[in-house]
Amino acid sequence: LKSINWLESLSKEKNCDKIVSLGDFFDSPTLNAEEVTALRDIKWNNELEHIFIVGNHETNTRDISYNVLNLLGLASYSIIDKPTSVSDGTYTYCFLPYIYNSERLKSLKEYFPDGEKNIIFSHNDIAGIQYGFYKSEEGFRLLDISSSCKLFLNGHIHNMTGLDADRKVF
């Protein structure tokens, strides 16, 4: 709760025009009374747009349109439960919710063909990334990511993994 209120306050201070949550805003597809009640204590910055990408923890069905984030949709916040893109003429902003391995297309370009104009906000597996004790074999390939967008921001992996200009993981 403190970190959310800090972010909402910082968004005012920095004159942001939107906040994008990269998935798993909630860590469970079911909320208890305490969690629902805590939502009242969030000091939302309603002067800007809020976009919430559905993560794997916010649903318990393969049809991610059934998700706990829909509760926030009641407050007129945007809930992204399918690949979506919006262009401002300079960049194409691409929003990619969690996609199960069996349903994932082979390439990001199949979702968003604009290449270098793309800025992708995602909550997905990435192949070749260290997840604690094991290395992911499923997900989008690093070479695919680096050739499909100008910037790729991903909320699924809970570490500080990055990809440098030479396409090396750091």
Regions found by a protein language model. Give the residues of each.
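Core catalytic region of metal-dependent phosphoesterases/phosphodiesterases
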Residues: 1-87, 145-149
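Hydrophobic/aromatic residues located in beta-strands of well-ordered beta-sheets
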Residues: 19, 50-52, 93, 118, ...
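Catalytic metal-binding/acid-base residues of hydrolase active sites
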Residues: 25-26, 56-59, 99, 125, ...
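Conserved beta-sheet core of the metallophosphoesterase superfamily
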Residues: 52, 132-170
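Conserved catalytic scaffold of divalent metal-dependent phosphoesterases
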Residues: 58-144, 167
